[in-house]
Amino acid sequence: MASVSSATFSGHGARSLLQFLRLVGQLKRVPRTGWVYRNVQRPESVSDHMYRMAVMAMVIKDDRLNKDRCVRLALVHDMAECIVGDIAPADNIPKEEKHRREEEAMKQITQLLPEDLRKELYELWEEYETQSSAEAKFVKQLDQCEMILQASEYEDLEHKPGRLQDFYDSTAGKFNHPEIVQLVSELEAERSTNIAAAASEPHS
């Protein structure tokens, strides 16, 4: 697999790279739809979500995995959303149609890159979509874990413990990586404490 650092750009190639960077830069301005639908103020962007996922891929221990590949998967897995937007379950778009739109978007995005990078980024996206490797399965759990961590943070910021329970419900039973299970357990314990404390406070 070619390394991203191996590519060189000049002339027309540099213009295409600039176009690619502007395109993926739109992810900074694509809000995560689930938060929008729940009326979260100043919801995070898709880029925000993928950044913390990439950090999680770096720091959550698993010597059996290719961690460099995990980071790359985290950075690419939602890249198509710079064109198609963040399609949420509440949008009621069939999974096959969502995949078709994102596949077309990834082909459009990667067309701006040299052949080796085009192949690498598209194959990373496809690997995540098909969950065809241990690394892809790990990153999928990071995706879910990052989401509920963000939900907890929004509850804290709003001083409304438990308001985003449906995000937790949607991930029930989906974690099996030992380190992620431990992290989720700690998060849920903290959150349960906050919910209990809020329930015991006298209401004015």
Swiss-Prot record:
Record keywords: Acetylation, Cobalt, Hydrolase, Magnesium, Manganese, Metal-binding, Phosphoprotein
EC number(s) per entry: 3.1.3.89
Residues engaged in binding a divalent metal cation 2: E81, D86, I87
One Gene Ontology molecular-function label: 5'-deoxynucleotidase activity
Disulphide bond pairs: none
Gene3D superfamilies on file: Hypothetical protein af1432 (1.10.3210.10)
ATP-binding is among the record's keywords: no
Needed co-factor(s): Mn(2+); Co(2+); Mg(2+)
InterPro entries according to UniProt: HD/PDEase_dom, HD_domain, YfbR/HDDC2
Catalysed transformations (reactions): a 2'-deoxyribonucleoside 5'-phosphate + H2O = a 2'-deoxyribonucleoside + phosphate
Cofactor detail note: Binds 2 divalent metal cations. Shows activity with Mn(2+), Co(2+) and Mg(2+) but shows no activity with Zn(2+).
Pfam family, one: HD_3
UniProt binding sites for a divalent metal cation 1: H49, H77, D78, D143
SMART domains linked: HDc
Modification type N-acetylalanine: residues: A2
Domain HD per the UniProt entry, residue ranges: 46-148
Residues recorded as bearing Phosphoserine in the entry: S3, S5, S204
Function: Catalyzes the dephosphorylation of the nucleoside 5'-monophosphates deoxyadenosine monophosphate (dAMP), deoxycytidine monophosphate (dCMP), deoxyguanosine monophosphate (dGMP) and deoxythymidine monophosphate (dTMP).
PANTHER family: 5'-DEOXYNUCLEOTIDASE HDDC2
Family statement: Belongs to the HDDC2 family.
Subunit structure: Homodimer.
Name of the protein in question: 5'-deoxynucleotidase HDDC2
Organism: Homo sapiens (Human)
Gene that encodes it: HDDC2
